[in-house]
Amino acid sequence: MQNSLLKPRIIEVEVLGAGHAKVVMEPFERGYGHTLGNALRRVLLSSMVGYAPTEVTIAGVVHEYSSLDGVQEDVVDLLLNLKGVVFKLHNRDDVTLTLKKDGEGAVLASDIELPHDVELVNPDHVIAHLTAGGKLDMQIKVEKGRGYVPGNVRRLSEDTNKTIGRIILDASFSPVRRVSYAVESARVEQRTDLDKLVINIETNGVISPEEAIRQSARVLVDQLNVFAALEGTEAPADAPSRAPAVDPILLRPVDDLELTVRSANCLKAENIYYIGDLIQRSENELLKTPNLGRKSLNEIKEVLASRGLTLGMKLENWPPAGLEK
């Protein structure tokens, strides 16, 4: 009788496109496909290190609801386009970059002035369009981070030297755009009750899908090593209690779920602004929402399921302090 657990012996990587791959691993003991697949998926979405614009200062702009003469896009659209620029920093945690452009035409990511240790993954990305006589002058701060951090959490209200016109951005640092997993049947000799784990992952190009999986596995190993070296210790009597940390995925706005306009508007009408707000609602509660029918409900359930979430979940630490509606 064999008492040791099986470890995957077959690992296949199928490249599906730039930054997109399917990774297949088998065999696993029954149940381990879901155990490891879900753990890897959650770490991939929440804990990978990446880079994102976090602050912007634009000449002639006081706040994000302004508009600029000679620029086709308003400031809100310009900032959304800027968030689509993919940066990669080498040997530094933050950098402030300059973008200056005048004259009619498109403003591209490649127009940003870069030092030698900053790289652009998508230099052809369009940031704005200038009309005749238009001009754009901006300072962009790019930082290293993990997951998703809303701007209202990052805002430094105690900063007395704050520059007028500095705009704090919601920062999506994660280099992983999408990840899903499936568990299929596998067979080894006479055993047919084994698992095959299939992970479909897409990144923004800062890291490869294979490297993303390697990094997520290291994060899990590092966390589980604490349990492997578990020793009983008595906690200090006066140790302050801490509120449990909130999963960064729950802090993302419902707009990040890429729902149809109808579904998104129905949710906002019910004051559901964040994914953490949404998952605490039951199916019956959502069906009572005006103009939200069964089709929209099924769409919401499918999108949540693709992220390992469901309706009707209970959160003890929601909403977290400082979260704005």
Swiss-Prot record:
InterPro entries noted in UniProt: DNA-dir_RNA_pol_insert (IPR011262), DNA-dir_RNA_pol_RpoA/D/Rpb3 (IPR011263), DNA-dir_RpoA (IPR011773), RBP11-like (IPR036603), RNAP_asu_C (IPR011260), RNApol_insert_sf (IPR036643)
Domain of life: Bacteria
One of the Pfam families matching this protein, by short name: RNA_pol_L
GO molecular function: DNA binding; DNA-directed RNA polymerase activity; protein dimerization activity
Residue ranges, annotated region (Alpha N-terminal domain (alpha-NTD)): 1-231
Gene Ontology biological process: DNA-templated transcription
Domain notes: The N-terminal domain is essential for RNAP assembly and basal transcription, whereas the C-terminal domain is involved in interaction with transcriptional regulators and with upstream promoter elements.
Subunit structure of this chain's protein: Homodimer. The RNAP catalytic core consists of 2 alpha, 1 beta, 1 beta' and 1 omega subunit. When a sigma factor is associated with the core the holoenzyme is formed, which can initiate transcription.
Protein family membership: Belongs to the RNA polymerase alpha chain family.
Protein name: DNA-directed RNA polymerase subunit alpha
Organism of this sequence: Janthinobacterium sp. (strain Marseille)
